[in-house]
Amino acid sequence: MEFSVKSGNPEKQRSACVVVGVFDRRKLSSAARVLDKASGGALSTILRRGDMDGEKGQTLWLYNLPNTLCERVLLVGCGKERDFDEPAYRSVIATVARTVNKSGAVEAVNYLTDLPVKGRDTLWKISQAVTITQDSLYSFQQLKSKKEDTQRPLKRIILSVPSRADLLPGEDAVRVATAISVGTKLTRDLANLPGNICNPTYLAEQALQLKKTYKGLKVEILEEADMEKLGMGALLSVSRGSEQPAKLITLEYRGGRKDAKPVVLVGKGITFDTGGISLKPGAEMDEMKFDMCGAASVLGVMKAVAEMMLPINLVGVVAAAENMPDGKATRPGDVVTSMSGQTIEILNTDAEGRLVLCDALSYVERFDPDVVIDIATLTGACIIALGHQATGLLSNHSPLANDLLGAGKQSYDRAWELPLWDEYQEQLKSNFADMANIGGRPAGTITAACFLSRFTKKYKWAHLDIAGVAWKSGKEKGATGRPVPLLMQYLLNKAS
């Protein structure tokens, strides 16, 4: 899909399709009014017939509109003008993408970017239009024998800007948003693959492929023998029951000053999670292929950053393993020693994500990081607390937490902060080791982060629990690509 920006009146566009908005009670948007005037009131006449009243999500195709140069016009209902906010804008952009893609038009000029959205400027609207369009048209068909392709898929979208002065900033917004979409697509593709394809070795191969594509990337892969030498007993306890060897994958991108400390991202990469000996219920266990979405998001961010050549130093670390039950698997009650030297009583082998993360969090001390952010589908408790709307955020550094919350609001990939109070640490006490790997049912998301916080004393750290946002279930089952937009906005802000 190609995107560009353009300034000009809708009636003068030689295109397969021009898209304009109509608000509730048939109120025309500014671009629609221009078309109406040029066509001698044809739009108003058609709307008065009752085919459309402007309700959000409605669409109406018009062909051969008088005194216009386009083949067809798509009217899109935007709802009440006073209520046209970020969710409404995102919703109508998605509607346009799907509707035009099915129409056979290969090109469209979209004037919805001219609509006023409360608190948002033109560049935000352009960026959102690019990413939402790409997300809406995403289709995972790699494993299907027959592809369900559109006969004439949409190839180009031209986004309207108010004036010629907005063209250069608009093109830059398109460039950045396109790179984010490329990274998000990689994240979704990796997460949607089944565990018999996407195992730890496959993730390592994908990192090496990124290195080939982007010459500025360095990649290092630690094998189990390397991790054994480093004392990563927690991480290795997870892969013990699997025939698939664990991998610790590091990607380095140096686009900033040589003396600038890097941002470090750490992704949980459990490529399939049966729960181990603490076996999960069979229902919906297939969705545990998504337990590597944190790792997939790290790889997606690395790709997006390299694609746009962002002036920042960034390290991505993927802790990859498969959690399976067999005769060699870790048992409930086993005690292991982490890379930090702290001992852990594993009361539940299904709380394995924190075990791979804690050793990775110790490992990243060697990079002398500015900040460390881990991303993990860590707890079902986060879904109970926040549902499927917000990423859970916990941090030992308030400014970092605020920066991430702000980036979430900017990108509309939102997060919500939960407390990391010392009182919750009491739930992790063990009679047989320095700590237990679970803290009971109460505050499960918080106690999981409390566990991780014991391995992050030497740097500023934030934890993103994406269990509720990384994938969808049901009819639309599949990975969402979150929180790539949040992380990219954070990095863009930091690099500016």
UniProtKB/Swiss-Prot annotation:
Compartments, as annotated in UniProt: Cytoplasm
The active site consists of K280, R354
Q: How is the cofactor bound?
A: Binds 2 manganese ions per subunit.
Role of this protein: Presumably involved in the processing and regular turnover of intracellular proteins. Catalyzes the removal of unsubstituted N-terminal amino acids from various peptides.
| Chief localization | cytoplasm
A GO BP entry = proteolysis
The record, for InterPro entries, names: Leucine_aapep/pepB, Macro_dom-like, Peptidase_M17_C, Peptidase_M17_leu_NH2_pept, Peptidase_M17_N
Protein name, as recorded: Probable cytosol aminopeptidase
Q: Does the keyword Protease apply?
A: yes
Q: Which organism is it from?
A: Thioalkalivibrio sulfidiphilus (strain HL-EbGR7)
Record's keyword terms, sorted: Aminopeptidase, Cytoplasm, Hydrolase, Manganese, Metal-binding, Protease
Chain residues that bind Mn(2+) 2: K268, D273, D291, E352
What GO cellular component is one of the record's annotations?
cytoplasm
Which NCBIfam families does this chain map to? PRK00913.1-2, PRK00913.1-4, PRK00913.2-4
Q: Which family does the record claim for this protein?
A: Belongs to the peptidase M17 family.
Tagged with keyword Acetylation? no
The GO molecular function terms of this record are: manganese ion binding; metalloaminopeptidase activity
Q: What class of enzyme is it?
A: hydrolase
**Which cofactors go with this protein?**
Mn(2+)
Binding positions for Mn(2+) 1 per the UniProt entry: D273, D350, E352
Enzyme nomenclature, EC number: 3.4.11.1, 3.4.11.10
Query: Reaction(s) catalyzed by this protein?
Result: Release of an N-terminal amino acid, Xaa-|-Yaa-, in which Xaa is preferably Leu, but may be other amino acids including Pro although not Arg or Lys, and Yaa may be Pro. Amino acid amides and methyl esters are also readily hydrolyzed, but rates on arylamides are exceedingly low; Release of an N-terminal amino acid, preferentially leucine, but not glutamic or aspartic acids
